Amino acid sequence: MQYKKTLVASALAATTLAAYAPSEPWSTLTPTATYSGGVTDYASTFGIAVQPISTTSSASSAATTASSKAKRAASQIGDGQVQAATTTASVSTKSSAAAVSQIGDGQIQATTKTTAAASLKLVMVKIQATTKTTAAAVSQIGDGQVQATTKTTAAAVSQITDGQVQATTKTTQAASQVSDGQVQATSATSASAAATSTDPVDAVSCKTSGTLEMNLKGGILTDGKGRIGSIVANRQFQFDGPPPQAGAIYAAGWSITPDGNLAIGDNDVFYQCLSGTFYNLYDEHIGSQCTPVHLEAIDLIDC
C-alpha cells in the first residue's frame, strides 16, 4: 500500500515539474528551443496586431501583400487578457496597424468587426494603437488575458484586467487601455521609430490611453503594468504578476522574429480561439473554433 502511494505521489510530482510553482524562479520557464535570428531585446515599447495565416496562399504572396494590408492590433483588458476584434477597418500607412487591446486582468482581446474606429473599451483595461504598416492593435483586459478580432484587417486586440489577451471578430484600427486595465488600439505612423535594415518591426500604430504596450528584455515580455507575459496552464497567452500565474508553462523565451512576429521559443504561430465576441490567444490549437495567426509586432506612437 505504501509502495502504491509512493508511485502515485511520484507521478503527480512529475506532471508538475514543467509548470511554475510560486517557490521557483519563474524566469527559467522557457522553451528548450529558440527562434533562429530572433531578437530577445527590443529597445522600444511595442504592441501586437493579429494577422491570420492563410493556408491556401504561398508565403511569397503573403509577403508581397503584407505592406498593403491593414492589420488588426490587439487590445488588453484590466486583468491582463489580450483580445482581438473580428472585423477589418481602414487604417493609415507605414504599414499602419490597429493595436490589440488589454483589459485590467491582463487578458488580451481583439474585435470581430470591421470599423475604422478604435476597438471598444471594456470595463477592465483596454489598449488601442495604429500604423507603420496599418494594423489593428490587440487589446488586453484587466486580468492579463489577450484577445483579438475575427476578421482580416485592422481590428485591435485588447487586454482585460486579469491579464488575459482577447481579440474581437471585426477589424478596428487601434487599441487603447482604460483605467481598469483594458487595452484597445488605433492607427498612425511613427517618425521616431523609423525602420532600419536591422529593425524587424515595420508597422506602427497610434498609442492611446489603454493601448497594450509591451517591452521585451532578455527574452522576458512585460506589459505597461509590469506584468509578465506568459503561457499559462490552459495554453493561453496573458500577463500576470510578477510572479506569473501558478502553473504557468512559459514565462520567458520570447523574441521578435526576423519577419517581425512575436515568438515563444522557436514557435511564431499562435491560435485565436473564439470566445463570445472575442478571440483569446493560445500557443497551441485547443479546439475547432481556433485558427492560426501571427502576432505582428508594431511600434506605438503618440498621435
Swiss-Prot record:
InterPro entries: PIR1-like_C, Yeast_CWMannoprotein_PIR, Yeast_PIR_rpt. GO terms for molecular function: structural constituent of cell wall. It is found in: Secreted, Cell wall. Residues 19-72 form a propeptide. Component of the outer cell wall layer. Required for stability of the cell wall and for optimal growth. Required for resistance against several antifungal and cell wall-perturbing agents and for tolerance to heat shock. The PIR1/2/3 repeats are required for the covalent linkage to the cell wall. Their number varies among different strains of S.cerevisiae. Pfam families: PIR (PF00399), PIR1-like_C (PF22799). The keyword Membrane does not apply. Its main location: secreted. It comes from the Eukaryota. This is Cell wall mannoprotein HSP150. Keywords: Cell wall, Cell wall biogenesis/degradation, Cleavage on pair of basic residues, Glycoprotein, Repeat, Secreted, Signal, Stress response. GO terms for biological process: fungal-type cell wall organization. Covalently linked to beta-1,3-glucan of the inner cell wall layer via an alkali-sensitive ester linkage between the gamma-carboxyl group of glutamic acids, arising from specific glutamines within the PIR1/2/3 repeats, and hydroxyl groups of glucoses of beta-1,3-glucan chains. It comes from Saccharomyces cerevisiae (strain AWRI1631) (Baker's yeast). GO terms for cellular component: extracellular region; fungal-type cell wall. Belongs to the PIR protein family. The record marks 81, 107, 145, 164, 182 as: Covalent attachment to cell wall glycan. The record marks 72-73 as: Cleavage. Residues 1-18 form the signal peptide. PIR1/2/3 repeats lie at residues 71-89, 97-113, 114-134, 135-153, 154-171, 172-190.
